[in-house]
Amino acid sequence: MSITVGHTTFDRVRYDAEADVLYLHVGDPSQAVDFDESPEGHALRYDGAGKLVGITLVNAKQLLDGAKPIVITIPERVTIDPAALAPAVQSAA
């Protein structure tokens, strides 16, 4: 499964149902060397070249239950249709 956010396609998608956290990564998560937080509170991970390689969404189920687009500023502001993330969260249920 892959999920595209803005111009980045994340090919590693993992949902931790116990913690309700959705992890999105491009390739090996260990390539992330810099970390930041979006204004909306989502964790962002970058590689050595400054390219976005990971997003962590806390309270993923709550975000999906709202049925409103999820906003992430990375640095441009993007929205994600909850339906695009739902399969990742539902697969762990």
Regions of interest found by a model, annotated:
Residues T4, T9, V71-T73, T79:
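Ser/Thr- (and often Asn-) enriched beta-sheet segments in non-cytosolic proteins
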Residues I3-S30:
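N-terminal first-folded block
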